[in-house]
């Protein structure tokens, strides 16, 4: 997926579609591309689409069929202007049911890049980096404990690292397996009770 984003602006089509489960990094990758490309972010129901389109556009999670016509016109304007559209979605457009057929067919014809949920090794490495970025030393046994008990997504990793950091600061304890166990067993809304 990163290689395709790096190929911009030499995409073979006006659009590129990133497909993957929640928390797999689609939005993050789209935001990286947005900054690199100087792209706008599509806001459903936002400003009227002006032609010619002056910047590439990032559409994140186009899940509401009520915005299909707006996205369809955006796609056509992008294609006519020689710009690009990056779409991040959980379901490939070919499997969109009850959606605007013209939008579905155009996005189905665009190149699709699948991003899978991260595996244990990647989640462990990401969590180690997240802790290191906050200058927190956490042992491998803590990371192993967490990875085996958490949802496999970057967002879940970020939230868990934040919760552990907050619990560590609140209790003045190092982040260890016992503290990790307490945090995992405590619903997020009850974190202050740890």
Positions of predicted regions on the chain:
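Conserved C-terminal helix/linker of AAA+ ATPases
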Residues: 168-185
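Short regulatory helix/loop adjacent to the ATP-binding pocket of P-loop NTPases
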Residues: 93-108
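Conserved AAA+ ATPase "SRH/arginine-finger" region at the nucleotide-binding site
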Residues: 110-122
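Walker A/P-loop nucleotide-binding motif
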Residues: 13-29
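Pre-Walker A (pre-P-loop) alpha-helix and adjacent loop at the N terminus of AAA/AAA+ ATPase modules
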Residues: 1-15
């Amino acid at each position: 997926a990163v290689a395709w984003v790096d190929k911009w602006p030499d995409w073979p089509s006006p659009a590129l579609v990133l497909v993957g489960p929640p928390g797999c990094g689609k939005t993050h990758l789209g935001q990286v591309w947005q900054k690199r490309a100087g792209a706008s972010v599509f806001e459903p129901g936002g400003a009227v689409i002006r032609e010619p389109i002056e910047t590439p556009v990032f559409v994140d999670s186009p899940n509401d069929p009520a915005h299909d016509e707006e996205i369809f016109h955006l796609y056509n304007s992008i294609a006519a202007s020689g710009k690009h559209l990056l779409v991040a979605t959980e379901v490939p457009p070919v499997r969109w049911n009850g959606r605007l057929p013209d939008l579905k067919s155009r996005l189905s014809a665009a190149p699709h890049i699948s991003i899978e949920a991260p595996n244990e090794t990647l989640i462990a490495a990401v969590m180690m980096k997240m802790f290191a970025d906050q200058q927190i030393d956490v042992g491998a046994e803590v990371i192993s404990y967490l990875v085996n008990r958490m949802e496999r997504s970057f967002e879940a990793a970020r939230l868990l690292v934040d919760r552990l950091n907050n619990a560590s600061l609140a209790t003045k304890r190092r982040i260890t397996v016992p503290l990790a166990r307490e945090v995992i067993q405590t619903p997020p809304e009850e974190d202050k009770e740890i």
